[in-house]
Amino acid sequence: MNPIRPVALLVTHGVLGEELVRTVAAILGPQPDVATVSNSGFSADGLTNAIEQRVREFPADAPVVLFTDLAAGSCGIASRRLGVEGRIVRKITGVNLPMLLEFFHYRDTLSLDELLPRMEAKGKAGIVIL
């Protein structure tokens, strides 16, 4: 069991992050310790500042898993510029529903080092050509 539950921050274009959180809640029930930041209306520096502010709103000892939609988009770039001293912030791009379900289902029982590769694998496995 994880001694300190990791928290989730989704940084996405438009309302994608909010809709993903709503969809997770419809499947697993409401999830605590999750927030979103949209890039809408922000400059590059403004988006980075908004992300930093959100990270600081979480408990100081909680590891933050920062999900972005596109690695090369404004959200991915801003997350790479993030500098929050004294915080554990792990970043993963290409957020999708299978990845988030894996995170919320296992964040209380697996360490971050176990959980992150599992989330990546589940996210990739969720992409199937039929």
Model-based region annotation:
Residues M1-L130:
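N-terminal loops that bind phosphate or other acidic moieties
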